[in-house]
Each structure stands twice: as structure tokens, then as C-alpha cells.
């Protein structure tokens, strides 16, 4: 039992040691960093850094300065020097004692002109060159019309306080715009004053969508037809009929109306499948002349020739023309 307890306590001890090792390492690293920072604080006056003279500084060493703080101190110095007009920055007197080689040059060496105005003039010049010809000549024609003064938005170089260099750049940009406006002349004024919508209304007055004839439908042959339709020459005919006269049956090839379906006789009124040249013959009759009696007895029903269901004792008609009519 004791061996088992000792074996189970060994991994727990290892876990505790592993958990305490990072804390020990962190403490040792922190002590080393503190010593290094103290050494740097005592050695800073030897590197040329300004320090307040007196025996009290050696007794009470100043806290160490991180090298990153030097870079951060340089950035506000660079940003605050152009914005400040001779006023000391908020960093104090220690910031003013930086060597001039590390920061910007002194204020006396700056040019007398304002750099922001020069940059604005250069940007205006580039914008004038990048404009398309259509927009540039319209704006210049309106701005440089003969007998018209300067625009209210513009001002002279003397009023804005521009330097001679900036005024020369402004005059150069204006001279570049002059030939474009002079080449157009009065046409540029007309186009700038009147938009192209007036031309559209002149071409198609009172028709905003370009409808030339609203009474006629799109693609129609007449005002009463449907979309893209043509009037039929024979509206009474049936679909697929080749016959000219109306009222004939479907697929009839006879020249005369009223014939039976599939009849190949030239005269109407013949029975179905009759091959005789004259109408009124009996069904299946192969005689050339009509009116010949049938060989069947009188009581038998006769096929279609003159009639179908003929009762017994009914006299046979003498002529087929009377029955056909």
C-alpha cells in the first residue's frame, strides 16, 4: 500500500514543480531587467543626454528611459514644429534641447512661403491637366468669357497671399486652358448654357419615349391588327384547306363543293368509293352506264347508290338523276 501511495505522489510532485518553474523564470528575468535599466539610467549622461546638474541626481538616480520613448518623442516634435508659430511645444524645455541634427532644421531656415499654399497650387494644376477636354473647355469658357470678371469663388494671388512661385504656377495653368476655350468660341458658350435635352425635344416633340405613331401597335400592319400580324386573304376558310370556295370539307380535292370524303369522281353527289364516271350508280358498280338493275332480290338491303335502307316492295326509281337531285 505504501508503494502505491508513493507511486501516485510522484507524478503530483512533478506537476507542481512544472507549474512553479515558469514563475521562477519570470522572477529571475524581471530582476535582470531591473538591473539593466538601472545601469542604463546611470550611463545616460555619458551618452550626451542633457541632465540637470547637481549632487542630488547622483544620489537619486533617475528612472531608466526606454529607447522606444525616444522615437515617440521625435514624432510629436516633427509634427508640432510646422504647426507651431514660434510657440514652445508642450513637451517642456527638455524637448527643445534636442540636437538640431536629429530633428527638423531650425525655423529660420524655412522658406518664407507657406508650403501648404504651394501644395494646393500644384494640386490645382494637376487637376486642370487631368480634366477631360469636354469638361475643361466648358468650365473655362464660362470662366474666361470676354467682358466677364473673375468668378466669385476665385481670388487674386495678392488677396490669398500666394508666393510669386505659386502665382506663376497659377498663371501657367490658366495659359494652358486658354487655347481650348478660344478654339471653340461661341459654340462652347451655347453648349455650356443650353443642355442637350433641348435638342432631343426639338427632334421628338411631345413624345418622350420616341413613339412616332402611337395609334399603330408595335409591328402591326394596321391600327386594328394584333402584335406583328397580317390580315388573312380568306378568313372564312378552314385551316389546311386548299379549296378556294368556303364551306368545303377537310382535305377535299374536288373542284366542286359538297362532295363526299375521299371522292375521286369529277362530279359531286357520287357514293363513297365509286369509280363510275357518272353519279347515281350503285355501290361497287363497275358498269359504265347508270340505271341498270341490281342482281339482288327485291327484299335485300342495297348498298349506297341511290339509297341505303329500301323496304321490300318499294319500286326502283327509273332514273338515278331524279334521286340524286
Curated annotation (Swiss-Prot):
Pfam families: STG. GO terms for cellular component: extracellular matrix; extracellular region. GO terms for biological process: extracellular matrix organization. Expressed in skin and tonsils. Residues 41-110, 147-189 are annotated as: Disordered. Keywords: Extracellular matrix, Secreted, Signal. The keyword Secreted applies. Residues 147-157 have a biased composition (Low complexity). The gene is C6orf15. The keyword Secreted applies. Residues 1-26 form the signal peptide. It comes from the Eukaryota. Its main location: secreted. This is Uncharacterized protein C6orf15. It is found in: Secreted, Extracellular space, Extracellular matrix. Binds to numerous extracellular matrix proteins. Residues 41-60 have a biased composition (Polar residues).
